[in-house]
Amino acid sequence: MAAFATAEACDSNAELISNGDLRALHPIFKIYGQRRCFSGPIVTLKVFEDNVLVRNQLETKGEGGVLVIDGGGSMRCALVGGNLGQLAQNNGWSGIVVNGCVRDVDEINDCDVGVRALGSNPLKSTKKGHGEKNVPVHIGGTLIRDGEWLYADSDGILISKTELSV
Ligand SMILES: O=C([O-])CC(=O)C(=O)O
């Protein structure tokens, strides 16, 4: 995929920004994974300290998509670790954004996938299978809908209602 720059995308899409179709997430995420720059259509998940749905989703073909996980901002355990990072890479996900924590950071950093999360915590999550898929989630000051597009690079993360021509 051609490299893009989120700053450039903001400058050249002022109208989309003013009407709310292009939004920047608040700068609350840390950068993990090999891909500092990634983009794709969004699949949303809403879970709380339980990552069964995360694994189920990453076991499917990603086809260049980005999994956006609203973990409610919990800092008490990790929703994604090295195994799931590897699964995401092998199944063709371009990235994972977690409103929550990751673990096995060194392993995730070896994976060919972009990962953003609030931080890391070595504790694993529960495995009950609770949560919702393909629902609107509220992360980093913006509402994110399943099927919208995400663009991430070193400057930050953009959410766009439609695919941008970059
Ligand atoms: O299964 C988990 O809880 C997450 C994890 O450690 C991994 O992906 O390796």
Swiss-Prot record:
Q: Which GO terms describe its cellular component?
A: plastid
Q: What is its EC number?
A: 4.1.3.17, 4.1.1.112
Q: At which positions is substrate bound? A: G81, G82, N83, L84, R103
Per UniProt, what is one GO molecular function of this protein?
oxaloacetate decarboxylase activity
Relay the cofactor remark from the entry: Divalent metal cation.
Cite the Pfam families for this sequence: RraA-like
Keywords from the UniProt entry: Acetylation, Lyase, Metal-binding
Which GO terms are recorded in the biological process aspect for this UniProt protein?
regulation of RNA metabolic process
Q: Which residues form the signal peptide?
A: none
Which residues take part in binding a divalent metal cation?
D104
Q: Which domain of life is it from?
A: Eukaryota
Q: Which residues are reported to carry the modification N-acetylalanine?
A: A2
> What reactions does this protein catalyze?
4-hydroxy-4-methyl-2-oxoglutarate = 2 pyruvate; oxaloacetate + H(+) = pyruvate + CO2
Cofactor names from the entry are: a divalent metal cation
Q: Which NCBIfam families match?
A: NOT-MenG, PRK09372.1
Its family remark reads: Belongs to the class II aldolase/RraA-like family.
Q: What does this protein do?
A: Catalyzes the aldol cleavage of 4-hydroxy-4-methyl-2-oxoglutarate (HMG) into 2 molecules of pyruvate. Also contains a secondary oxaloacetate (OAA) decarboxylase activity due to the common pyruvate enolate transition state formed following C-C bond cleavage in the retro-aldol and decarboxylation reactions.
Subunit info here reads:
Homotrimer.
Q: What is this protein called?
A: Putative 4-hydroxy-4-methyl-2-oxoglutarate aldolase 3
